Each structure stands twice: as C-alpha cells, then as structure tokens.
C-alpha cells in the first residue's frame, strides 16, 4: 500500500469533486483564517494533540490533505498511515501556496 499519493492541483481538485473523501487542512489557525478550501477541516499538524485529534476520524475513509507548501502535509500523511489509516490518502503537491 502506498503511504499516500502526491497530486497536482488539477488532479487534487478533480478528486474533491468525484471522491467521497474528507478534506483536511493541516496548516495553523492563522493560515486557515487567511484562506482555505471550501469544506476543509482544520487539524493543525503542529498541534501537540494532532494524533489525539486524528484518532476521532474514520481510519477507513479517504482523505485529501494539504498544508501551505507541502512539507507539513507530507508529514501528516505519513503520520496518518502510521496511525493505521487504511483508506486512500491524497496530498496536494506544493500545498495551498501552489494554487496561486
């Protein structure tokens, strides 16, 4: 099983439209307030309670994950897989900044 799939913005947005998945923003609250994708759920990766917060989510669901530039998003995807998340995990290459 692949840890996660790194997607271009075009493919990521097509997954938002076609895949039954949870959209997860792992940036901090200030970044989220400055702008975020519609219907995104904020779970900051740098929050010390990230693992605890993620334990409330369905480990069999599919996830679309993004951060500001891609670094935290990759770490979050790997962490989710190590926590036993078995659904498909998709990561937005270049993060939210890459959408501009």
Please give the residue ranges for each predicted region.
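Rhodanese-like catalytic fold shared by cysteine-dependent sulfurtransferases
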Residues: 1-21, 29-62, 68-100
